[in-house]
C-alpha cells in the first residue's frame, strides 16, 4: 500500500509541476518617441517574475538585444534582480556581453551589427528580473508591429507613441477592440492579464490568434527599383540559361541565388530598411531575404523574363487614413513563363508554384510487385486535389519477417499530412490543415500462395468539416482497398477538433495504411 501511495503522490506532484507556469511578466512597457530631428527613441522595460527552475536556467536567464551601431545607439538604463526577500542585486558589468548575431555571420557587410547579451544574475525561485533600455535610431520613418503575446502571461502591457507636432500616426489593431488614449501627440494602449502563447502543432500564426498592433508614420510603401548595373554580370546570367527551356532557365537562376548567395535572416529594420542593389548582393555573396529576392528578380529581367516582387501587403484602415504594411520576410519572386505566372522563393530551391492554382494529381497504373517466384498485380487509381499534394510514390513490398515470409504493402498517401501523434487530446487553438479531396483505389490480385493477413475494414462517416471512407475487403482472389478523405475547411475550429482528431487517427491508422501478406511456398 505504501508503494502505491508514493507512486500516486509522485504522479500528482508531476502533474502540478507541468501545469504550473514557468514565469510571469508583471509589466512590459514599450515607448516610442519620434523626434523632430529625425531620430526615434525606443524605450523597453520588463519586470519578469521567474517561477520554475527551467525559467531561469533555460528560458529567461539571458536577454538578447540586437542593434546596429551604424545608425543606432543602445543605453542600458536599469538592470537588476529583486530577490524573493526583497533585496536588490544590480547586474554586474561583466554580465553585459556584446557579440555578433548568428544571423550576421558569413557577410562582411553586416559584421558591424551587435547583439548585447544581458546575463541576469542572482536568480532564484520567485525572483523578479528588471531590465530597462533605450535604443536611439536615426531613421526616416517610424514603422512597428507589436505582438501582444509572450511565452509567459503578462499582467500589464503598455505601448505608447509620441510624435512631433504635425506628424500623423497610422495605426490598426487586429484581434482586439482596444483603442488608444490620446493626449496631445501621445497615443497609449494598455492591456491587462494577457495569456501566454499556445505551443501547439498545426496552429495558425500568432498574428491570427492574438492581438497585434500595426504602427506607421508612412502611408504607402515604395517599389524597389531595378539595378541598371547588373549587365556587368551578363556572362554569369548567360551561363545559367538552358537552351529551349524557359522554366529550367528561371529555376537555374533562382537556384544560383538560393545556393550560392549566403542568406542573412535579419529584419529590414536592422539595416535601416535599406535594400541592397543586386550588384552589392552579388559582389558580397550575401544578403537579406529582400536582397536575394531583388537579385533573383533583376537576374530574371536581365535574362529576358517578365519578373516582379510579390511582397505580402495589406492596406489597413486608420482614423488618420489608409496605410500599407508589408511582410518582406515572406517575399516571393513572380515570373511569367509561357503566359503563366509562377512564384519562386529566393531563399530555397522549392518548386515554383503556379499562382492561384491548386495542385491536382490523377494517377492510373497497373503495377507488378515481385515476390520470390510469384507476382502480385496491383491496379491503382488515385485522384488528389490539394495545394501541397505530393507525387505518387513507387509501389513496393516491404519485408516484415523474412523467415516466416511476412510482407507489407504501404498505401501511398499524397495529400493531407497531419500526424495524429501531434494532436493532443485537448486543444486551445484551431488546426491549420488545408482543404483536401483525396480518393485512392487499389485492386490487388492475389495468387493462390499469397494470403492477406488482416480483418475487413469498413469505416465511413461525415462531419461538418469533411468526410472519410476506408474499406478493405477481399472479393474472391482480389483484395480491394478504398480510401477517401475530404476536408472542406482550411482550418478546423476548436469546437470540431475532437472529431477531426479522431478522423486523422482513423486516416493514418497503420492497420489501414499497411496491407500485410503471408507468402506460402
Tell where the protein language model's regions lie, with residue ranges:
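Sec-dependent N-terminal signal peptides
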Residues: 4-13
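Sec/Tat signal peptide C-region and signal peptidase I cleavage site
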Residues: 13-19
Amino acid at each position: 500500500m505504501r508503494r502505491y501511495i508514493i507512486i500516486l503522490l509522485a504522479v500528482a506532484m508531476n502533474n502540478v509541476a507541468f501545469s504550473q507556469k514557468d514565469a510571469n511578466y508583471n509589466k512590459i512597457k514599450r515607448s516610442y518617441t519620434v523626434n523632430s530631428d529625425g531620430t526615434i527613441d525606443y524605450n523597453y522595460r520588463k519586470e519578469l517574475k521567474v517561477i520554475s527552475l527551467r525559467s531561469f536556467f533555460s528560458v529567461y536567464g539571458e536577454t538578447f538585444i540586437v542593434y546596429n551601431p551604424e545608425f543606432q545607439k543602445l543605453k542600458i538604463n536599469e538592470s537588476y534582480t529583486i530577490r524573493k526577500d526583497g533585496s536588490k542585486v544590480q547586474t554586474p558589468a561583466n554580465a553585459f556581453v556584446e557579440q555578433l548575431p548568428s544571423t550576421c555571420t558569413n557577410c562582411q557587410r553586416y559584421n558591424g551589427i551587435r547583439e548585447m547579451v544581458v546575463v541576469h544574475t542572482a536568480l532564484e525561485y520567485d525572483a523578479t528580473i528588471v531590465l530597462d533600455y533605450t535604443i536611439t535610431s536615426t531613421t526616416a520613418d517610424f514603422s512597428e508591429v507589436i505582438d501582444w503575446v509572450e511565452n509567459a502571461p503578462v499582467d500589464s502591457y503598455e505601448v505608447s507613441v509620441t510624435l512631433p507636432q504635425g506628424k500623423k500616426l497610422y495605426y490598426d489593431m487586429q484581434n482586439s477592440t482596444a483603442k488608444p488614449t490620446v493626449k496631445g501627440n501621445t497615443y497609449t494602449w494598455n492591456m491587462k492579464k494577457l495569456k501566454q502563447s499556445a505551443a501547439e502543432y498545426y496552429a495558425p500564426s500568432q498574428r491570427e490568434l492574438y492581438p497585434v498592433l500595426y504602427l506607421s508614420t508612412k502611408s504607402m510603401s515604395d517599389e524597389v527599383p531595378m539595378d541598371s548595373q547588373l549587365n556587368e554580370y551578363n556572362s554569369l546570367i548567360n551561363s545559367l540559361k538552358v537552351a529551349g527551356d524557359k522554366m529550367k532557365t528561371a529555376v537555374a537562376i533562382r537556384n544560383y541565388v538560393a545556393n550560392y548567395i549566403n542568406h542573412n535572416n535579419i529584419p529590414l529594420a536592422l539595416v535601416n530598411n535599406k535594400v541592397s542593389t543586386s550588384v552589392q548582393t552579388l559582389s558580397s555573396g550575401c544578403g537579406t531575404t529582400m536582397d536575394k529576392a531583388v537579385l533573383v528578380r533583376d537576374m530574371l529581367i536581365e535574362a529576358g523574363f517578365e519578373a516582379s516582387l510579390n511582397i505580402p501587403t495589406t492596406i489597413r484602415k486608420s482614423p488618420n487614413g489608409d496605410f500599407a504594411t508589408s511582410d518582406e520576410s515572406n517575399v516571393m519572386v513572380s515570373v511569367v513563363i509561357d503566359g503563366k505566372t509562377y512564384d519562386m522563393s529566393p531563399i530555397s530551391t522549392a518548386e515554383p508554384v503556379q499562382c492561384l492554382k491548386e495542385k491536382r494529381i490523377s494517377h492510373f497504373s497497373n503495377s507488378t510487385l515481385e515476390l520470390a517466384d510469384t507476382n502480385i498485380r496491383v491496379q491503382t487509381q488515385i485522384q488528389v486535389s490539394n495545394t501541397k499534394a505530393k507525387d505518387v510514390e513507387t509501389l513496393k513490398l516491404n519485408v516484415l519477417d523474412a523467415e516466416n515470409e511476412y510482407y507489407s504493402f504501404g498505401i501511398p498517401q499524397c495529400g493531407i499530412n497531419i500526424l495524429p501523434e501531434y494532436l493532443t487530446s485537448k486543444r486551445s487553438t484551431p488546426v491549420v490543415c488545408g482543404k483536401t479531396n483525396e480518393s485512392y483505389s487499389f485492386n490487388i490480385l492475389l495468387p493462390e500462395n499469397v494470403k492477406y493477413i488482416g480483418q475487413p475494414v469498413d469505416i465511413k462517416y461525415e462531419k461538418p468539416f469533411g468526410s472519410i471512407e476506408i474499406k478493405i475487403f477481399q472479393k474472391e482472389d482480389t483484395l480491394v482497398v478504398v480510401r477517401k478523405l475530404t476536408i472542406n475547411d482550411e482550418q478546423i475550429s476548436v469546437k470540431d477538433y475532437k472529431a477531426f482528431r479522431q478522423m486523422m487517427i482513423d486516416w493514418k491508422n497503420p492497420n489501414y495504411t499497411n496491407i500485410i501478406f503471408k507468402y506460402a511456398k
